[in-house]
Swiss-Prot record:
It comes from Gloydius halys. It comes from the Eukaryota. GO terms for biological process: proteolysis. This is Thrombin-like enzyme AhV_TL-I. Expressed by the venom gland. The keyword tRNA-binding does not apply. Keywords: Disulfide bond, Fibrinogenolytic toxin, Glycoprotein, Hemostasis impairing toxin, Hydrolase, Protease, Secreted, Serine protease, Toxin. N-glycosylated at Asn-81 by a disaccharide composed of two N-acetylglucosamine (NAG). The presence of this N-glycan deforms the enzyme and Removing the carbohydrate moiety increases the esterase activity, but induces a complete loss of contractile response on mouse thoracic aorta. Pfam families: Trypsin. Its EC number is 3.4.21.-. Residues 1-229 form the Peptidase S1 domain.
Length: 238
């Protein structure tokens, strides 16, 4: 997270960290949506990874920290055919449920769609310098704004983004506040509702007029609820 500060230890009980089993490198975030399921970005998938819940400092563990591995992973269309503007979403079923504790609690899915102009909070253990690989020990948090989708389309002509998309655009037009490498998969929380999953942005991060894109959770609710209910062949929104 660029331009933020250390998150309050009590404000991110739903935030999970994905890290490689071998090198213990933290590579993505995610959001606990109930005792057994985590929502993150499809591009965060790896062969072997673990999920750390209830974590704040990487060096000093919380007493209620928990580790899980994926029992099942679900992708929209049950394939990995996500593109920059579509289907960058993955549902992970944990190998065993977690109980709520001091630093662990799920975040409910959104009850209404987000509105442009909302203030949104982003969080994660990703880079805190736009260009250097400086990673913090604790998660950083910052507020950004939900922008018109066109504001993510115009600055990136090379991506040939479609006119409409199940993607949210969020950032600060003057730059300086943004998600960055390592924050992918983490939540975008607008007006207190979980509305987006960090998907992609510019490199270097936080440049003026180069906001980032977030997968729109609201558009995928039916798919999410179906998968959790056991309808594993549920189709993704077209």
């Amino acid at each position: 997270i660029i331009g933020g500060d250390e998150c309050n230890i009590n404000e991110h009980r739903f935030l999970v960290a994905l890290y490689t089993s071998r090198s213990r490198t933290l590579f993505c975030g995610g959001t606990l949506i109930n005792q057994e399921w985590v929502l993150t970005a499809a591009h965060c998938d790896r062969k072997n990874f673990r999920i750390k819940l209830g974590m704040h400092s990487k060096k000093v563990p919380n007493e209620d920290e928990q580790t899980r591995v994926p029992k099942e992973k679900f992708f929209c269309l049950s394939s990995k055919n996500y593109t920059l503007w579509d289907k960058d979403i993955m549902l992970i079923r944990l190998d065993s449920p977690v109980k709520n504790s001091k630093h662990i609690a799920p975040f409910s899915l959104p009850s209404s769609p987000p509105s442009v102009g909302s203030v949104c909070r982003i969080m994660g253990w990703g880079r805190i310098s736009p260009t250097e690989g400086t990673y913090p020990d604790v998660p950083h948090c910052v507020n950004i704004n939900l922008l018109e989708y066109e504001m993510c389309r115009a600055p990136y002509p090379e991506f040939e983004l479609p006119a409409t998309s199940r993607t949210l655009c969020a950032g600060i037009l003057e730059g300086g506040k943004d998600t960055c490498k390592g924050d992918s998969g983490g939540p975008l929380i607008c007006n207190g509702q979980f509305q987006g999953i960090a998907s992609w942005g510019d490199d270097p991060c936080a440049q003026p007029h180069k906001p980032a894109a977030y997968t729109k959770v609201f558009d995928h609710l039916d798919w999410i609820e179906n998968i959790i209910a056991g309808n594993t062949d549920a189709s993704c929104p077209p």
